[in-house]
Regions:
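Active-site-adjacent structural elements in enzyme catalytic cores
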Residues: 1-180
Length: 180
């Protein structure tokens, strides 16, 4: 795969990519050091978990998340698409991701090029590409102004949808909208 940054991401690097919603500051969700680096680069509150992009529903198993038929129906109703779904994950080894909330938010994007990248890299954390408290970058140039050489690569440009994902919570088998 020739997409810029795939090898960098596979080896624990951090970059900026256009996701299905906004530009994201991305890195491997399965690499604790990478996730910590993203928190530092972004200046993000350590208590706020990150959204994880996945390439298929089966990727949830990587995080120890099993789901029943009812949950599967909910997932298939909203995915693929710009909806992040909060699910229970009390696994201690993923504390660096859930930050004590014992839940994780996942999104399976509809953007085919992004899903192709995810198939090669594995799940990625992808908070918006901006320092905490500032507006999300709307161009690669803006992201470069924010992060300069603190990241390992910048992906190809493009026009973001300019709206963050909807977030729903299904931890109690009910669909609750957290952010629309």
């Amino acid at each position: 795969m020739n997409e810029p940054g795939v090898q960098v991401l596979k080896s624990g690097g951090v970059g900026v990519l256009l996701t299905d919603t906004l530009y994201g500051l991305v890195g491997s969700a399965l690499n604790k050091k990478t996730v910590g680096r993203i928190y530092r680069i972004k200046g993000r509150n350590n208590k706020k978990p990150l959204i994880i992009l996945i390439s298929a529903i089966e990727d949830l198993k990587l995080f120890g998340i099993e789901h029943d038929g009812k949950t599967e129906k909910i997932l298939k109703k909203f995915w693929p698409g710009p909806v992040s779904i909060i699910m229970p994950c009390a696994k201690k080894r993923f504390e660096y991701l859930h930050r004590g909330t014992q839940t994780l938010a996942f999104r399976l994007p509809a953007k085919k090029t992004l899903v192709k990248i995810l198939k090669h890299t594995g799940p990625l954390v992808a908070p918006s590409a901006n320092p905490e408290g500032l507006p999300p970058a709307s161009t690669i140039q803006e992201a470069k102004k924010y992060f300069g050489d603190k990241v390992d690569f910048y992906g190809r440009g493009g026009v973001p949808k300019a709206k963050p994902s909807t977030i729903i919570n299904i931890t109690d088998n009910k669909v609750r909208i957290i952010r629309k």
